[in-house]
């Protein structure tokens, strides 16, 4: 059974970094979503199969702007972790940019 043990060890060597990458992505999404909420973005849960299907058609974990009736609307879709859509306007987007810059400075301050 030495060959079987080698296969198991190899599978673990491959799987562990992938699990780590998923955890990092989940953590980054959580951090961004906390900033969006702090900036005043409204979280809308995809609490029906139809809403979740709509959410999955949007670019995942990207802040996207759209013009509606002459006003900008910003949205951030997370179909994987929170299964929700964050929505805000120019005021919330400006607050988000300020908070994100403050967080960047805090993290990279020597």
Description of each model-found segment:
Residues 1-9:
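Bacterial N-terminal signal peptides that target proteins for export
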Residues 52-110:
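Intrinsically disordered, glycine/charged-rich N-terminal periplasmic/extracytoplasmic linker segments
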Residues 33-53:
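Compact soluble domain cores
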Residues 22-25:
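Bacterial signal peptide processing site
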Residues 17-20:
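C-terminal motif of bacterial Sec signal peptides marking the signal peptidase cleavage site
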């Amino acid at each position: 059974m030495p060959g079987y043990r080698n296969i198991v060890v190899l599978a673990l060597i491959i799987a562990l970094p992938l699990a780590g990458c998923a955890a990092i992505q989940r953590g980054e999404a959580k951090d961004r979503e906390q900033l969006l909420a702090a900036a005043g973005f409204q979280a809308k849960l995809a609490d029906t199969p139809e809403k979740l299907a709509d959410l999955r058609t949007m670019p995942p974990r990207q802040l996207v702007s759209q013009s509606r009736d002459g006003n900008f609307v910003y949205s951030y879709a997370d179909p994987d972790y929170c299964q929700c859509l964050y929505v805000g306007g120019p005021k919330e987007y400006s607050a988000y940019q300020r908070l994100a810059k403050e967080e960047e400075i805090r993290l990279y301050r020597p």
